[in-house]
Amino acid sequence: MSETTLPDYLTVATELQSASLAVNPAEMHGLLTGMLSGGLNLADKSWQPLIFDYTNEGMGWPDRALTLAEATLKVTTSEITGSGMELSMLLPDEDASASLFDLADGVSDWINHFISGLGLVGAQLNKASDGTKEALADLEEMAKLGIDEDDDMEEQAQLLEHVIEHVKACALTIHAEFGARPSEDAAPTIH
């Protein structure tokens, strides 16, 4: 069985930019992951009007950009609802010639849009458990973090990796409380 992975950051960035969409790949993925973690219905395309409204003034996305978003959503759904407790993040990387500053900005963009995604699907965060409220508070704080150019870059890179792992843990915690689970008979019946 081959492992499905997120689309390439640079490919997604190029497509979103050429479609003149007001979102970068990290923001798109954070938004989709937040929507999933907030209880997005897994069986329909209810996410599309939400993302169209949020990123493109209600207008649909061009087919290629929408296909990349669907592929991203499919991989993320598989990861976040699976038993592996894994979550990949679509962030700037070496292939996109990203600096440590770009990566930190991407993490912040991802977190802010994750939180927006929770709101778009109407997650009842005020009724969340203490653990979930703590995870959300941690995310809000991590979204404010930045890289200090006067500090040791290698140390900052290691710290950022720890932050990324904590972001993933927080997102999984929130999904565990609010996210939809695929049903056993998720495949539609064909008559």
Curated annotation (Swiss-Prot):
Give the CC-aspect GO terms: cytosol
Q: Which InterPro entries does this chain map to?
A: YgfB-like, YgfB-like_sf
Q: Which domain of life is it from?
A: Bacteria
Query: Which Gene3D superfamilies does this UniProt record tie to the protein?
Result: YgfB uncharacterised protein family UPF0149, PF03695
> Disulfide pairs?
none
Q: Which family does it belong to?
A: Belongs to the UPF0149 family.
What name appears for this protein in its UniProt entry? UPF0149 protein VS_2635
Organism in which the protein naturally occurs: Vibrio atlanticus (strain LGP32) (Vibrio splendidus (strain Mel32))
